[in-house]
């Protein structure tokens, strides 16, 4: 999470330079119009606030690929990372053993055919290529939380999740809601500049639960 690891060829040694006071008005921010047409007032309010801040918002279309069919790639990668845990049967010691708990995800992943894994990764590369093309024209995009979670897990694009208000549940509890800002690969500085500006002007992060 901090610095490069010369034993991991997938990690690059790159500088991180972020000026929290840099100008945000030069940023080009995308949003998927159809995602904000849903009945989530706080998400729509986020777009309104960004426009009030004078930011340049443009409508975009995310790559049209069945990313949900590639979710098992992440399960296989997680299973490989925790292979020793499964082989040693120490996964039995984990408390949650429900169908979709991690121990059973690790176990099921061992049954996925290698051919299917390779084919899915070929499609994943196409998605990554299309996302790179999209992000070359914008600095970041805004999305309702979880809408782009699987997509960015597959492509590696950085994401900042921010509070964007509160809503009342059916049980009359008031719970916080959130919005996601997704940036370019190695574009965390611009991503954090936009996120900090939004957070500072809204102040939702300053609201704490009452004891």
Regions found by a protein language model. Name each.
Residues 31, 59, 142-143:
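Structural recognition of the beta-strand scaffold that forms the well-ordered cores
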Residues 6-12, 54-63, 92-96, 206-210:
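Flexible, glycine/charged-enriched surface loops at secondary-structure junctions
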Residues 17, 38-61, 82-93, 117, ...:
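Acyltransferase
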Residues 1, 84, 111-211:
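Glycine-rich, small-residue loops and helix-cap segments
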Residues 23-32, 72-125, 163, 170-179:
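Short helix-loop capping/hinge segments that flank enzyme active sites or metal/cofactor-binding pockets
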Residues 55-72, 106:
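Short connector loops at secondary-structure junctions
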């Amino acid at each position: 999470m901090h610095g490069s690891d010369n034993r991991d060829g997938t990690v690059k040694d790159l500088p991180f330079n972020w000026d929290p006071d840099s100008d945000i008005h030069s940023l080009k921010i995308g949003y998927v119009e159809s995602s904000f047409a849903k009945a989530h007032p706080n998400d729509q309010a986020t777009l309104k606030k960004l426009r009030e801040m004078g930011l340049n918002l443009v409508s975009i279309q995310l790559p049209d690929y069945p990313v949900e069919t590639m979710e098992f790639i992440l399960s296989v990668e997680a299973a490989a990372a925790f292979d020793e845990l499964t082989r040693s049967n120490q996964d039995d010691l984990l408390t949650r053993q429900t169908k979709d708990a991690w121990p059973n995800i690790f176990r099921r992943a061992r049954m996925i055919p290698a051919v299917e894994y390779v084919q899915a990764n070929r499609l994943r590369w196409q998605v990554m290529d299309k996302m790179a093309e999209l992000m070359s024209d914008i600095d970041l995009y805004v999305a309702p939380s979880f809408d782009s979670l699987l997509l960015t897990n597959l492509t590696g694009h950085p994401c900042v999740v921010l509070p964007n208000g509160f809503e009342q549940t059916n049980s009359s509890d008031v719970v916080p809601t959130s919005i996601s800002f997704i940036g370019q690969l190695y574009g965390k500085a611009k991503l954090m500049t936009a996120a900090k500006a939004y957070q500072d002007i809204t102040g939702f992060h300053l609201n704490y639960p009452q004891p």
